Amino acid sequence: MRNETRFKYNAAMAQLAKLNNVEKVSHKFNVAPTVQQKLEDKIQLSSAFLQKINVFLVDEQSGSAVGLGISRPTASRTNTDTNDRQAKDPSNMDERFYFCRKTDFDTAIKYQKLDQWAKFKDFYARFSGQIQKRQGLDRIMIGFNGTSFAATTDIVANPKLQDVNKGWLQKMREENVARVLSSGTAQGKITIGKLGDYKNVDALVMTLVDEMIDEVHQDNPDLVVLCNRKTVADKYFPLVNQDQPNSEKLAADIIISQKRMDNLPVYAVPFFPEDTILVTT
């Protein structure tokens, strides 16, 4: 490490120690709550997708993850000459449980790369930004691919971090099975095409909304489709893989720029499993 790099690196570590009110960061310490919240915010900001989802910090390792929903109407009328007005509780409690497991983010950056960054005035921002970005990407990868939690993980056998923790899709499979469509005419798979269960992916998304989502939420303007980029390409590739007059090409470009499935906005998310679709808000 060059002397200039060492100077900037030491200054960065001193600043990190000051933020956490410790003498040195070379010793184990608990991250200060305000720093922890700022770090969480920066991890979310490192990813356009993470900015669109809710993330809650909790104090307890385990507990109830209680979701609040509105399931019944409240509009009514009462003849107060004879009866008192009665308030109604419109909420339904969708109670599930969480258990936080320690996840290590052990990071090493070679001196050569630090030397390259040392010439920039925003050295520390680059240094910490790379780590935050990778942590954000790992969170997304686990969220969509995690199926289990191992005492010692194996990156070779599980390159998509399947054994680090149970992800969002796995939690759906285990805790919300009534809203998971996994089979068509054949057990364990759904086919799309002329002879398939659905003629196209739009019909599949329509079924998911009509049959898997409560009626009160079916017209929610925040509903979106999450899928793999390949799934999006499979739908729109026929539009571009042909000779077209300019007018038709323009129409195709407009359609592709406003990617939708069953009129819902589509987001191709990093690390999302192929042959999987999630309709959510």
Residue ranges and their predicted role:
Residues 22-37, 141-153, 219-223:
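Short glycine-rich, low-complexity/disordered patches
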Residues 101-103, 125, 221:
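Residues at beta-strand starts and edge strands
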